[in-house]
Amino acid sequence: MSKRIAGPEIERLIQLLAKVPGLGPRSARRAALHLIKKKEQLFSPLTTAMAEALAKVRVCSVCGNVDTSDPCTICTDPRRESATLIVVEDVSDLWALERAAALNARYHVLGGTLSPLDGVGPDDLNIKGLVSRIAEGGVSEVILAVNATVEGQATAHYITDQLVGLEVRVTKLAHGVPVGGELDYLDEGTLAAALKSRTAF
């Protein structure tokens, strides 16, 4: 049995921080200590920001993004290319694509992937909303920006089947060698995908 090194309030803070993706028990302890040491500069503003986020953040009823407005900033931006719809698994994927700033398109967040083993079926995802958005018209291309996992690819195939009969071009992200990547460090699946999706030079 491990010794208690702090009071229950600090232990609870560490336990909660450890639940944040990317933070294990050790990182959570470091983060908790840092927050406590920087109470005025960091801890108090952080708790205020978290309370405000909890009160104001909502899920966009159009695309599934999270924002302080509904519809979200992306959906209400008139400069967005409304004919292109990028389908992502989660909000974190949407944010990653936005950071890349490669396309000024609109998005649709599925809320996960099909996973029969985990009990996640089509009705558990925002697929009906996607089909409805496309059926309303105005979308000419759907980009399936899902992960290259078994579940991600199964979800992409299912969505493609659901879009049959609608006048929309369905594309997917290219898979292959990352920018700055060295072939020797890539796995066989990535190399095979890169060879199959090769382009003219």
UniProtKB/Swiss-Prot annotation:
Gene3D superfamilies: 3.40.1360.10, 6.10.250.240, RecR Domain 1
BP terms from Gene Ontology: DNA recombination; DNA repair
GO MF annotation, one: DNA binding
A Pfam family reported for this protein in Swiss-Prot or TrEMBL: RecR_C
Zinc finger (C4-type): 60-75
Domain Toprim: 83-178
UniProt cross-references to InterPro entries, sorted A to Z: DNA_Rcmb_RecR, Rcmb_RecR, Rcmb_RecR_Znf, TOPRIM_dom, TOPRIM_RecR
Keywords: DNA damage, DNA recombination, DNA repair, Metal-binding, Zinc, Zinc-finger
Described purpose of this protein according to its UniProt entry: May play a role in DNA repair. It seems to be involved in an RecBC-independent recombinational process of DNA repair. It may act with RecF and RecO.
Family: Belongs to the RecR family.
Name this polypeptide is given: Recombination protein RecR
Organism, as annotated: Chelativorans sp. (strain BNC1)
The organism's taxonomic lineage, starting at the top: Bacteria, Pseudomonadati, Pseudomonadota, Alphaproteobacteria, Hyphomicrobiales
